From Swiss-Prot:
Protein name per Swiss-Prot or TrEMBL: CASP-like protein 4C1
GO cellular component terms, semicolon-separated: plasma membrane
Extracellular-side positions: 53-71, 125-150
Bilayer topology: Multi-pass membrane protein
Subunit structure: Homodimer and heterodimers.
Hydrolase found in the keyword field: no
Sites where a glycan is attached: 125
Residues that span the membrane, as ranges: 32-52, 72-92, 104-124, 151-171
């Protein structure tokens, strides 16, 4: 259920008119956000799984022996869980035409968490990239370990791109909420 927002100077609330075309545009916009959130989930989960399964033999390298790779795994796993929650919220919003939380909370929750987790992912994957670059000399003996680490980091960067686009959309919704008193631009 949408809660109408009062005007800033205490006046009456404004009721928004939504035509059938407007509702179709809103569903398309929400579906587009869902696609980007699903993509961020898939790539972050794949990155976490690639890093988690990156161990070769008992005497060679293990991902958990390197702080940077543990950071890559943890950040991608956290973003995968967050993206799963946001996909659930997006499906709820598409199916019921209402947000999971009150509208003001949902708009700021989405935007704030998208920003925090996007920067977390960028930071973790940048740290992992530096570790992988530093290890290039040691990779002559453990080539599969290094290749799988590179793949996990690359998947994490792609997950960051999709989460960044989701953050742009949620930022657009915040601006619409500030201007119109509703998360919709119509």
């Amino acid at each position: 259920m949408r809660f109408p927002q009062p005007h800033r100077n205490g006046g009456e609330t404004q009721q928004h008119f939504h035509s059938t075309i407007s509702l179709q545009k809103l569903k398309r916009f929400n579906s587009l956000i869902l696609v980007f959130r699903f993509s961020a989930f898939c790539f972050s989960l794949a990155s976490a799984v690639f890093m988690l399964t990156n161990s070769r033999g008992s005497d060679s390298f293990h991902w958990y022996n390197f702080d940077a790779f543990r950071y890559v795994f943890a950040a991608n796993a956290i973003v995968a869980v967050y993206s799963l929650f946001e996909m659930t919220a997006a499906v709820w919003e598409i199916s019921r035409n209402a947000t999971l939380f009150p509208e003001v909370c949902q708009v700021w929750f989405d935007f704030g968490h998208d920003q925090v987790f996007a920067y977390l992912l960028l930071s973790a994957n940048s740290t992992g990239t530096e570790m992988a670059r530093t290890m290039k000399d040691a990779c002559t003996d453990n080539k599969p370990f290094c290749v799988q680490s590179d793949i996990a980091i690359a998947l994490g960067f792609v997950g960051f791109l999709f989460l960044g686009v989701s953050s742009l959309f949620s930022g657009f919704r915040v601006v619409c909420f500030i201007i119109n008193g509703s998360r919709f631009y119509v």
